[in-house]
């Protein structure tokens, strides 16, 4: 059992709190029973897990997860018992939940995840422009998966999608949603014109000319969401075929990026679901 916060395995997990550590190790940190359960459900086994068996043993869900951890260990995965203070030392969360693990970035590469998703003739893409807030990023990734977005493209100056706070807010989206990050706007533009070519590129902004729900979002569509404070950059705006807005009442001027993206993406999902059902 790991009892010391200076144990090499604890240091290995702590290194994943920062981007350079994640890049050097090829790993990212997941924390808490929900995320570890989500990884197992996605057939992803962490490269290293530390866990407190007493904490997990206090609930039915925790005991079930403990069985999966021990099963993975029996199959050769590294899973080590640790005391609560040791887990707290490894954790980025304010309130550690009895388990932390390191997952290989190679296991969530976008091309690998795309193999497990159905290809569509009318894809829905999401591009993020200098999105800085980790909570917003995680919320958007979670909504993108729920709304069946095909791929998320992250432009320059976006927060690292594998930062611990983003991963926690994403609530398991990272295990299913293809995310391409560190892209230039030229590379994103090339993705829009690749096969199948995107028919409309929408930029969401308060001064948009068209209400988001007045467009046909069943087309091959890309949505661009801009920086929380400054909106979309000139490079991103240059790709747009339409500027859209979300009508609001009672003198509310704007929504945060996470909510705005979710509203528009779920309208696209609604239209696509209705289109697949056909006329009543």
Residue ranges and their predicted role:
Residues 101, 143-147, 158-174, 234-280:
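Structured adenosyl-cofactor binding patch, chiefly the S-adenosyl-L-methionine
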Residues 2, 28, 129-130, 155-156, ...:
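Glycine- and other small-residue-rich loops at beta-strand/loop junctions that grip anionic moieties
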Residues 202-252:
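Active-site/ligand-binding-proximal alpha/beta "capping" segment
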Residues 1-94:
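N-terminal positively charged helical leader segments and presequences
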Residues 33, 54-56, 86, 106, ...:
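Short glycine-rich anion-binding loops that position phosphate/pyrophosphate groups of nucleotides
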Residues 71, 85, 102-208:
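RNA substrate-binding interface of SAM-dependent RNA methyltransferases
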Residues 32, 132-139, 255-260:
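Amphipathic alpha-helical repeat scaffolds
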């Amino acid at each position: 059992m790991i009892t010391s916060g200076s144990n090499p395995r604890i240091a290995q997990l702590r290194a994943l709190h920062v981007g350079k550590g994640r890049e050097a190790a090829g790993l990212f940190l997941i924390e808490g029973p929900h995320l570890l359960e989500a990884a197992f459900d996605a057939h992803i086994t962490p490269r290293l897990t530390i866990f407190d068996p007493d904490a997990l043993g206090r609930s039915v869900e925790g005991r079930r997860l403990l069985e999966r951890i021990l099963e993975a260990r029996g199959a050769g995965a590294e899973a080590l018992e640790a005391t609560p203070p040791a887990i707290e030392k490894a954790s980025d969360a304010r309130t550690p939940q009895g388990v932390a693990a390191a997952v290989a970035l190679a296991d969530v590469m976008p091309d690998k995840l795309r193999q497990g998703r159905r290809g569509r003739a009318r894809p829905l893409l999401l591009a993020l422009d200098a999105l800085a807030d980790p909570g917003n990023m995680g919320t958007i990734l979670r909504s993108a998966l729920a709304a069946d977005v095909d791929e998320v493209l992250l432009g320059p100056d976006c927060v690292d999608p594998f930062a611990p706070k983003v991963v926690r807010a994403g609530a398991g989206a990272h295990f299913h949603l293809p995310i391409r990050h560190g892209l230039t706007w030229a590379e994103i533009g090339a993705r829009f014109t690749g096969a199948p070519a995107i028919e409309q590129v929408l930029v969401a902004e308060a001064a948009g000319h068209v209400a988001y729900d007045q467009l046909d979002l069943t087309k091959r569509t890309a949505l661009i969401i801009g920086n929380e404070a400054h909106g979309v950059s000139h490079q991103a705006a240059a790709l747009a075929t339409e500027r859209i807005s979300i009508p609001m009442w009672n003198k509310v001027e704007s929504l945060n990026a996470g909510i705005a993206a979710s509203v528009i993406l779920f309208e696209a999902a609604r239209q696509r679901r209705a289109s697949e059902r056909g006329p009543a």
